[in-house]
Amino acid sequence: MALKITGKSEGQLQLHLYTKQKQFAVPDVPYSIRANVSNKELNVLINTLLKDSGNSEAGKVEFDFLLNGEFVKIPLGQHLKEREISFEDTVELEYVERYPAPEPQDCLLHDDWVSAVEAKDNWILTGCYDNTLNIWTTKGKHKLTIPGHIAPVKGVTWISLDEEKGVFASASQDQTVMLWEWNVKANSVECVQVCKGHERGVDCIAANRSKTRMATGSWDTMLKIWSTDVRNDGDSQPSTSKRQKLDTEKARTPVLTLAGHRECISGVQWIDDNTLVTSSWDHTIKIWDLALSGIKSEICGHKSFFDLSYSHLNGLIIAASPDKNLRLYDPKSNQGTIVKNTYLGHTQWVQSVRWSTTNEYLFVSGAYDNHVKLWDYRSPKAPIFELIGHEDKVLACDWSNPKFILSGGSDNSVRVFKSKIAIGEQK
């Protein structure tokens, strides 16, 4: 039995439709369609089949289509011709729920450029070129401005957060990393440790998943590992004299220093508690093994890398470069230096990139062209959405909280976009 979508004198295709999202499955039969069928018509077909089978989601969902792992953006027959795929064989076409468009929610105005941003739960932490940190609610209320650094803040990361207390860290061009303790109810903050050891500005920071260590990369080309313990050198109950010393010095040295890059380390991420990955202006991405205190492997590019993001969902690395492009790498591959995909869409330097923490296919990027773009890594030729709002360069982006896509820029603002949950991801 075959269902037909046909027209006069048009080429025909035999189509097998399938999906990995079982709640949207249609009858497993061949479909005879005309070659120039559009995505809109395929959507009508699938929703009609869902309705006929009594599926309650029929008509509520739009779908995208993949052939051999690549999105089909043009009429199907044209897609086949461009890729020299035979019309004689049955076409195996996968369909997936189209991701809902993020909605602009808020604009958080600061006094200077916003160069770092990270969300956790209902709170947003930002770092600025006026040397301050700021804490906001995800509803747009400003809670606290935090002075302390004496040069622009280039990176921030949450260590822990509950209803009573938050701990976070900041990295600055003043060559220091500061560890902060925030009393949530009193809305007061204290710098509990100043991490010293870098000899030039610190450009990036990240905490491991167990939140026991943090890593920093600097213009001094060094990667340093630090304890995130708010207590002095792990003392559980310091004596009065030790407390006085802590109050006056609050200085911490690195647990480990790793050399290997030749230029600025622009991005750092933890793969696991013993493995890190860094990007650098020296055209390399390096994977580090802390047990060996050295480099495990490296990826060599042809341009500087300005940032990178590692996905714990798919094990892939996405990297940003000054040539306007983003590149996808598989660090597990024996051909790790070969680019799996190049993503075209930005018109100026790409400064920041972050994977979704809940969807293995999606990531966001921010660039000097004032744009934030949302990508599906299966669609390299164009982003699936452009998040409009910034009036100047985008310096940082974040998707730590799955509900919000955040971006900071040289227009002194953080843009907050509400990230909708696809029907297929809802519990």
From Swiss-Prot:
PROSITE patterns membership: WD_REPEATS_1, WD_REPEATS_2, WD_REPEATS_REGION
Where would I find the WD repeats?
Answer: 109-146, 148-190, 197-236, 260-298, 301-339, 345-385, 389-427
Query: Entry's Gene3D superfamilies?
Result: YVTN repeat-like/Quinoprotein amine dehydrogenase (2.130.10.10)
Ranges for the region named Ubiquitin-like (UBL) domain are: 13-97
Q: Which InterPro entries match?
A: G-protein_beta_WD-40_rep (IPR020472), NLE (IPR012972), WD40/YVTN_repeat-like_dom_sf (IPR015943), WD40_repeat_CS (IPR019775), WD40_repeat_dom_sf (IPR036322), WD40_rpt (IPR001680), WDR12/Ytm1 (IPR028599)
Which residue stretches, if any, does this entry annotate as coiled coil?
Answer: none
Q: Where in the cell is it found?
A: Nucleus, Nucleolus; Nucleus, Nucleoplasm
Q: Which GO terms describe its molecular function?
A: ribonucleoprotein complex binding
**GO CC: one term?**
PeBoW complex
Gene Ontology annotations of biological process type? maturation of 5.8S rRNA from tricistronic rRNA transcript (SSU-rRNA, 5.8S rRNA, LSU-rRNA); maturation of LSU-rRNA from tricistronic rRNA transcript (SSU-rRNA, 5.8S rRNA, LSU-rRNA)
Q: Does the keyword Repeat apply?
A: yes
Q: What is its main location?
A: nucleus
**Which UniProt keywords are given for this protein, alphabetically ordered?**
Nucleus, Repeat, Ribosome biogenesis, rRNA processing, WD repeat
The family database entries (CDD domains) matched by this protein are listed as: WD40
Role this protein plays = Required for maturation of ribosomal RNAs and formation of the large ribosomal subunit.
Q: Which family does it belong to?
A: Belongs to the WD repeat WDR12/YTM1 family.
What is the recorded name of this protein? Ribosome biogenesis protein WDR12 homolog
Q: Which organism is it from?
A: Aedes aegypti
Write the lineage as a comma-separated list. Answer: Eukaryota, Metazoa, Ecdysozoa, Arthropoda, Hexapoda
